[in-house]
Amino acid sequence: MSGHSKWATTKHKKAVIDARRAKSFAKLIKNIEVAAKIGGADLSGNPTLVDAVQKAKKTSVPNDNIDRAIKRGAGLTGESIDYTTIMYEGYGPGGVALLIECLTENKNRAAAEVRTAMTRNGGTMADPGSVAYNFHRKGVIVVPHADGVDEDAVLVAVLEAGAEEVTDLGESFEVLTEATDLVAARTALQAAGIDYDSADAEFVATVTVQTDAEAARKVFRLIDALEDSDDVQNVYTTLDLSAEVQAQLDDE
């Protein structure tokens, strides 16, 4: 259950990306709007909305912004929320596969921005289905390190709720579940009094690619360029960092 998870290391620069607060806030608000539109404004009956709100609060999105997003999404303000999810596939430097998740009200703009970011940063677009098979949909819960919360405590809390793996990432624990077990595992953590930062359904690579430090830098630059687009919600990759490459990047 526990131990090193290769795919987890690919997210070591996530904190740097999330530091772009304005972009991050806008994307978190969009998630709340969509969750409220699909499941309604009542948090007690909409677990997806609960997780979207939790993630926004942990990223310091103001409560007023969150409340307005819920009302907009649920249609309580008279505004129209019409986002479409689009998945793009491609390859980055070093043969790293990319799955690019967009949430947009303008498909043409999203396609153009993704293609431009890929072309300018060493990436190439791929045919639908040619990359996606390298990923499985999984539930991913991030639990911050805290007093009295160690890997065993997290494991005990989520084991009966369908958790597959608990990994210590240094500053947090990551819980991996089937996507269908995400809410159950998150609820089990809450019942055990363990706080969590985020609980999301994500695409996790089943096949990984190791590169040298230079190629890894190029991949991260490509991810940065893609996530600069307001329409790009998430970028998933098959990149796996060896301990040596990880150390080189951390020293920069």
Swiss-Prot record:
Q: Which controlled-vocabulary keywords does the entry list?
A: Cytoplasm, DNA-binding, Transcription, Transcription regulation
Checking InterPro entries in the record gives:
Integrase-like_N, TACO1_YebC-like_2nd/3rd_dom, TACO1_YebC_N, Transcrip_reg_TACO1-like, Transcrip_reg_TACO1-like_dom3, YebC-like
Q: Where in the cell is it found?
A: Cytoplasm
Recorded hits in Pfam families, A to Z, give: TACO1_YebC_N, Transcrip_reg
Q: Which GO terms describe its biological process?
A: regulation of DNA-templated transcription
Reading the lineage from the top rank, the first entry is: Bacteria
**Entries under NCBIfam families matching the protein:** PRK00110.1, PRK12378.1, YebC/PmpR family DNA-binding transcriptional regulator
Family annotation (HAMAP family)? Transcrip_reg_TACO1 (MF_00693)
- Protein name stated in the entry: Probable transcriptional regulatory protein Lxx10750
Q: Which organism is it from?
A: Leifsonia xyli subsp. xyli (strain CTCB07)
